[in-house]
Amino acid sequence: MQTEWWKDAVVYQIYPRSFQDSNGDGIGDLRGIIQRLDYIRSLGATVIWLCPIYASPLIDNGYDISDYYAIHPELGTMEDFDCLLRQAHQRGLRVIMDLVVNHTSDQHRWFQEGTSGQNPAYRDYYIWETEKPNRWGSWFGGSAWEYNTQVGAHYLHIFAKKQPDLNWQNPALRDEIYRMMSW
């Protein structure tokens, strides 16, 4: 009987910005990770776990994603990511990524268009209340509810104020997230 790969995996987690700088700008990047794949494999790792590399304003170390379909430019390009995948697989390494689907950045297109009225359907991708419904606190301090003047309501943010929580009760949001996950 063959066990699932993840049961016996040796996982090496990488925070890309501090791992290996390939171009001398002081910020680790995808090319830097590629340069160290042989080293990672020599440690016995079978899986690389990447912390967020998506486009982000970096309020919360990349966990405030503004575009699930783009790489943060300081970390590289989509071509660099494709190269990382190819090179890792050639060495027998799997690559997994942080899946941040509790919230987005307030700079994400969904939040921007939903709050500006440009695409009102996106407003319901987030959790809104006209009045603060409770006294929940944010992990980052203060209230977990932030008032948005454009909408005239409070949105939930369990983390930073610039990380509005997603409304998983909305089937359209779930479809968007599932589409991104299978991309």
Task: State the predicted function of each range.
Residues 1-178, 182:
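Acidic/aromatic-lined carbohydrate-recognition and catalytic surfaces
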